[in-house]
């Protein structure tokens, strides 16, 4: 004899079913996740304007794809979208190389009053110029892997899923990126030893 239910219309599926996922509002998504998406976009792109564009593109993509989102790690999904958009952009720009401004050129960009914009102040307080310049010198694939690992704190498994590559490739890219970063930042270690 089957077990009795607590009511005539109740089935075991009713007890096992999870509540339906309700997508958050557009405002909730942007308010909660924009600082993290912008930080990732800035570290990947290396400048404020590209980071703003990448952040905007990410949220446009999220808005278009939210109905097909399968509940899981929302932050991981945002990382994947942001990183893939960055890599797509880097591939499109691969034929054109832009040279970074030298230290002497930067002095010409200071506002006449001698003060920078609020964004520039934030960057100077929170982002290290040498580290960002070293990140910018990496290939987009290496940069994405090392930023996701060392700055965003993702595991190798999460990076592999985000980038759609094998775990061995993740390890290799991170190892090579770190070696290039060590080489690019070697002058800092020497100045610490001297000082």
Predicted regions: what they are:
Residues 32-34, 43-44, 147-154:
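Short helix-capping/turn signature of helix-turn-helix
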Residues 39, 53-60, 64, 73-84:
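Structural recognition of an alpha-helix C-terminal capping motif at a helix-to-coil junction
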